[in-house]
């Protein structure tokens, strides 16, 4: 009836056509893409495609690469220790000196001091 027989192989989902030439077509609209996955290099020739830049953080050619497909890629780990930062001093006398220097630099006129009168009871 409508049941599949066990000896019938499923139909192919993709069709493989071997390349007619290993040389890429030499037209200005043809691009070659190489993808390296676990020691296997896949080369795709895309003809009739437009140029589009897609910058990534980790991208490199897979030539002579055996394990990862990346070659001469900078290390992007963030768990490296940071260089020591310059510590600020907490000495109050240094703060007062810098405060006095700032007051000498300012050009705004200060208001004249007035004598305080104290009332004694």
UniProtKB/Swiss-Prot annotation:
Can the keyword Acyltransferase be found in this entry's annotation? Answer: no
Q: What induces it?
A: VP1 and VP2 are detected 12 hours post infection, while VP3 only after 24 hours.
UniProt cross-references to Pfam families, sorted A to Z: CAV_VP3
A GO CC term assigned to this protein in UniProt = host cell nucleus
- Mind listing the GO biological process terms from this record? symbiont-mediated activation of host apoptosis; symbiont-mediated perturbation of host exit from mitosis
| Compositionally biased residues, Polar residues | 58-70
Give me the stretches of Basic and acidic residues compositional bias.
88-102
Where does the source fall among the domains of life?
Viruses
For the region Disordered, what residue ranges are annotated?
1-28, 57-121
Keyword Transit peptide included in the entry's annotation: no
Q: Which UniProt keywords apply?
A: Apoptosis, Early protein, Host nucleus, Host-virus interaction, Inhibition of host mitotic exit by virus, Modulation of host cell cycle by virus
Q: Where in the cell is it found?
A: Host nucleus
Its family remark reads: Belongs to the gyrovirus apoptin family.
What is its biological role? Answer: May act as transcriptional regulator. Induces apoptosis in infected cells. Element of infectious replication cycle.
This one is known as: Apoptin
């Amino acid at each position: 009836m409508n049941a599949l027989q066990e000896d019938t192989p499923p139909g192919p989902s993709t069709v493989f056509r071997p390349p007619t030439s290993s040389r890429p077509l030499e037209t200005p609209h043809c691009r070659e893409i190489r993808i390296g996955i676990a020691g296997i290099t896949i080369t795709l020739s895309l003809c009739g495609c437009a140029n589009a830049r897609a910058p990534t953080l980790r991208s490199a050619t897979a030539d002579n690469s055996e394990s990862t497909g990346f070659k001469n890629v900078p290390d992007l780990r963030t768990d490296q220790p940071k260089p020591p930062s310059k510590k600020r001093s907490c000495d109050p006398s240094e703060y007062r000196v810098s405060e006095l220097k700032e007051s000498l630099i300012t050009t705004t006129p200060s208001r004249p001091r007035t004598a305080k009168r104290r009332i004694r009871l």
